[in-house]
Amino acid sequence: MSNDKIIVALDVPDTESAIALIDKLESVTFWKVGLELFTSSGPRILEVLKSRQKRIFLDLKFHDIPNTVAGACRAAAGYGVDLMTIHATSGRDALKAAKEAVEEGAAQAGVKPPKLIAVTVLTSISARQLALDLKIPSELPEYALDMALMAQEMGLDGAVCSPQEVAHLRQICGDDFVLVCPGVRPTWAEAGDQKRSLTPSQAIQAGADYLVIGRPITAAAEPELAWKRISQELTTVV
């Protein structure tokens, strides 16, 4: 199993911290840039990653009215990233507009369109929170599936889901639908605020295409060793 299945979350506050981590973990090929770092650094961090021939998951989780989402996706697609996200709860019209805008933005910039991935349910949300806080009566696995199927119907390339839903989504959505799993925790790492996690090997065996792993690697006393341990774990997965 290739370690390019692992996307390491570059969840640091500024460009300088990001560069230090990128250079420390030279063998990492795929990095996630999220809200904190992109808000702090802007497109500069994407240029840093591209200059080092790294793949990029731009995880900004757009969630707004269709016109606004489309504009943001059109701009983001021009950066030449590999994956980007939108909340499925933005609705059908926004999802459709976003997908069309991604194609337009990439064409205008002369780059390959990124895969547009829908966030189903944040991995920090429990079934209890879904029911009590968000007032959604569906069972969490079925709600995640409904969001993924809506995204697939609107032409999106895949979905973000917890490892606990990935097997069900893989069975229903098929092999060509890209499934990205955050909330992955090795047995030796703390769960933190992740409510619905599995180990890296369990998530891949369940059907995940990519794993997003942050703190178990980046906050480890020895990040290089943590990265190697997880990579080694995945070599046993067929």
From Swiss-Prot:
Any one GO molecular-function label of the UniProt entry: orotidine-5'-phosphate decarboxylase activity
Q: Which InterPro entries match?
A: Aldolase_TIM (IPR013785), OMPdecase (IPR014732), OMPdecase_AS (IPR018089), OMPdecase_bac (IPR047596), OMPdeCOase_dom (IPR001754), RibuloseP-bd_barrel (IPR011060)
Q: What is this protein called?
A: Orotidine 5'-phosphate decarboxylase
Active site (catalytic residues): K61
UniProt similarity note: Belongs to the OMP decarboxylase family. Type 1 subfamily.
Assembly and interaction partners: Homodimer.
Physiological role: Catalyzes the decarboxylation of orotidine 5'-monophosphate (OMP) to uridine 5'-monophosphate (UMP).
Q: Which organism is it from?
A: Nostoc sp. (strain PCC 7120 / SAG 25.82 / UTEX 2576)
Q: Name one Pfam family in it.
A: OMPdecase
UniProt GO cellular component terms: cytosol
Q: Which gene encodes it?
A: pyrF
Q: Where does substrate bind?
A: 11, 32, 59-68, 123, 185, 194, 214-215
**SMART domains tied to this protein:** OMPdecase
Indicate the transmembrane segments per the record: none
Please state the Enzyme Commission number of this protein: 4.1.1.23
A GO biological process of this protein is: 'de novo' UMP biosynthetic process
List the pathway annotation.
Pyrimidine metabolism; UMP biosynthesis via de novo pathway; UMP from orotate: step 2/2
Q: Which reaction does it catalyse?
A: orotidine 5'-phosphate + H(+) = UMP + CO2
- Alphabetized UniProt keyword annotations: Decarboxylase, Lyase, Pyrimidine biosynthesis
